[in-house]
From Swiss-Prot:
This is Capsid protein. Belongs to the anelloviridae capsid protein family. Self-assembles to form an icosahedral capsid with a T=1 symmetry, about 30 nm in diameter, and consisting of 60 capsid proteins. The capsid encapsulates the genomic DNA. Capsid protein is involved in attachment and entry into the host cell. Residues 575-595 are annotated as: Disordered. Pfam families: TT_ORF1 (PF02956). It comes from Torque teno midi virus 1 (isolate MD1-073). InterPro entries: TTvirus_Unk (IPR004219).
Length: 673
């Protein structure tokens, strides 16, 4: 029936209804009534419109399925966070494969992990997961979902979030978002209380996570899909029972041991100097100054100028410099830093080398705060001028130091830490000493003042020789500042001072490829028999998805009359990579060891560094101004040819990068090349 069937004019309604006749007092003659034959009323006229086939406003794009499809589940166990007391400010993802020093705590208080197919394959090589189906002879893949299971800890609570919106890049403010207090204020989060906090709760929580929001449900080549990020999991250890003050603490404030910037005016103690020069806190320091301290448990008076300038026969030109910064008696030795009195010819002289400050995190709103790296190679105290990544402004100290050390470690080289130290500017640090420093505070660990390494580790010979403040002797104080923040575990002087967030993941993929026909068949009667347990299953063979090239496989169209075509064999020979494990020994140097893949956030500067160099090289002009004589014409031609080859190489690099970005857009738009 048409759609207007229920709305049509119902002409039979009221057919048997007669109006009630009116009665008059006087009888009138009946009017002649002629009965007409009943006739069906005419149908309502409608304007007939011709049917026109119009185009659809939307179009459904379909993709042909591969001939062979198998469901693969990648199951494994992982630890998003693990660490110990003293590492709350660090990211455990960066410390995963680091070699921790003896007696040093490892790990971190939060973790940010990126999962991709390439990372899952790297974990399979480490025997950290299993693949239920092999991806051999399967060049296509589809990502379906991920099921994460989080297991509760005995004493430590956790806050977990996940993100499905790429890109996952890092800047100097990224890790602050993963502070436990910041995660608790998010709208969507997973709170995993410990067994002590919630004794009657379930021991685990399960969460099903969908694919990235802009990813299409279609088939992709494994080689292109392997390096793309699928999921970001971030978690932080927190304390729901003692959010702001620990169970064994008297108050929230912490004490900072800082270098007195009025005494240590020069910051060039890392620069070597030849005799007769050596490091001095300031240029006009009196050589006869005596430092009075209780070093070694008794009152001692130490004249450092006399000890440094006492030359020993046979010493080199750098002997005075190394004595001025040595642990035995330099300007940063315990004899100087523990001094409670300085005098010149029995007259008290100020300022003292160390100043104590008290930091109150409850009133710190970040206004006017600055955290920056100060060089120890030259100059005086001051803000960095050229590198904006070396400074953080307008952030509370307990939040600004959260993950900042690992950010510099990832984006810069680790060699910057022996040449710099952290300095803060904050009005929320107060002191009661009369010789107050300037507006900035160069803090150091108390163990450095006592002449010890952090966590009582062994002092090496180079450390005894170069005993001066660096970032390495500030980590305990940085952790104490971060511990003063809200909801950070405060486990100092406690027995249970470690944590670990154990997780189980199950990534669901579908592998697709050609249907393998014409498989070899042998006579079963000629098969050999050997003893083997029937219950043991043979392990699956897994191929690196990044090297699983579609052009190296035989498909149905590569067979003709039961034989492989010559075109298919030629295509495979051109695209088949050589396995480095099968190469013969040679006299050439071995290839450098490949760096382990870390599931960390991406640095956008490193991504574009090579491309920027190629673009700059295209704009370079030849600066050769030699006269064109017969002798140097050949040299000029060779230089021009080399420059053309370099330009050609840079253009190929740019085109390759453009194609990679186009393939990345295919994950979101589905546009084929």
């Amino acid at each position: 029936m048409p759609f207007w069937w229920g709305r049509r004019n119902k002409f039979w309604y009221g057919r048997n209804y007669r109006r009630k006749k009116r009665r008059f007092p006087k009888r009138r003659k009946r009017r002649f009534y002629r009965r007409t034959k009943y006739r069906r009323p005419a149908r309502r006229r409608r304007r007939r419109r011709r049917k026109v086939r119009r185009k659809k406003k939307t179009l459904i794009v379909r993709q042909w399925q591969p001939d062979s499809i198998v469901l693969c589940k990648i199951k494994g166990y992982d630890s998003i966070i693990w660490g110990a007391e003293g590492t709350q400010f660090q990211c455990s993802t960066h410390e995963m494969y680091e070699y921790t020093r003896q007696k040093y705590p490892g790990g971190g208080g939060f973790g940010v992990q990126l999962y991709s197919l390439e990372y899952l394959y790297d974990q399979w090589k480490l025997r950290n997961n299993i693949w239920t189906k092999t991806n051999q002879l399967k060049d296509l893949c589809r990502y379906l979902k991920c099921v994460m299971t989080f297991y509760r800890h005995q004493h430590i609570d956790f806050v977990i979030v996940y993100e499905r919106q790429p890109p996952f890049e890092i800047d100097k403010l990224t890790y602050m978002k993963y502070h436990p207090y910041m995660l608790l204020q998010r709208k969507h989060k997973i709170i995993l209380p410990s067994q002590t906090t919630n004794p009657r709760g379930k021991l685990k929580k399960k969460k099903t996570i969908k694919p990235p929001k802009q990813m299409l449900s279609k088939w992709f080549f494994q080689q292109q899909f392997a390096k793309y990020d699928l999921l970001l999991i971030a978690a932080a250890a927190c304390s729901l029972r003692y959010p702001r003050i620990g169970c064994c603490n008297e108050n929230r404030m912490i004490t900072l041991y800082c270098l007195n910037t009025k005494f240590y005016q020069d910051t060039e103690w890392g620069t070597t100097k030849q005799a007769p020069h050596y490091f001095k806190p300031y240029a006009t320091i009196n050589k006869s100054m005596i430092f009075v301290s209780n070093y070694g448990g008794k009152k001692t008076e130490y004249n450092i100028g006399q000890w440094i300038e006492t030359d020993i026969p046979g010493e080199g030109n750098l002997a005075r410099y190394y004595r001025s910064i040595s642990k035995e008696g330099g300007y940063f030795s315990p004899k100087i830093l523990q001094a409670y009195q300085t005098k010149v010819k029995s007259v008290d002289y100020k300022p003292l080398p160390i100043v104590l400050g008290r930091y109150n995190p409850a009133i710190d709103d970040g206004k006017g705060n600055k955290i920056y790296l100060q060089t120890i190679m030259n100059g005086h105290w001051g803000l960095p001028q050229k590198t904006p990544d070396y400074i953080i402004e307008e952030v509370p100290l307990w939040l600004g130091f959260w993950g900042y050390y690992n950010y510099l470690k990832q984006t810069r080289t680790e060699a910057i830490f022996p040449l710099h130290m952290f300095v803060v500017q904050s009005k929320y640090i107060q002191t009661q000493q009369t010789e107050t420093p300037n507006n900035f505070w160069a803090f150091i660990d108390n163990s450095f003042i006592q002449g010890k390494n952090p966590w009582d580790s062994v002092i090496t010979y180079s450390e005894q020789k170069l005993w001066f403040p660096t970032v390495a002797w500030q980590l305990k104080t940085i952790n104490a500042i971060c511990e003063s923040g809200p909801y950070v575990p405060k486990l100092d002087n406690q027995t249970y001072s470690t944590w670990e967030l154990a997780t189980h993941y199950s990534f669901h993929f579908k592998w697709g490829g050609p249907q393998i026909s014409d498989q070899p068949v042998e006579d079963p009667g000629n098969k050999n028999k050997y003893d083997v347990p029937d219950t043991i299953k043979e392990a699956l063979q897994i191929v690196n998805p990044a090297k699983n090239i579609a052009a190296t496989m035989f498909h149905d169209w590569d067979y003709r009359r039961g034989c492989i075509t010559s075109t298919a064999i030629k295509r495979m020979q051109q695209n088949l990579p050589t396995d480095s494990s099968l190469e013969s020994d040679s006299d050439s140097e071995p290839a450098p060891k490949k760096k382990r893949l870390l599931p960390v956030l991406h640095d956008p500067q490193k991504k574009t560094e090579k491309i920027n160099q190629c673009l700059l090289s295209l704009c370079e002009e030849s600066t050769c101004q030699e006269q064109e004589t017969e002798e140097n014409i050949l040299k000029l031609i060779q230089q021009q040819q080399q420059q053309q080859q370099k330009l050609k190489h840079n253009l190929l690099v740019l085109i390759k990068d453009l194609k990679v970005k186009q393939r990345l857009l295919q994950l979101q738009t589905g546009v084929l090349e």
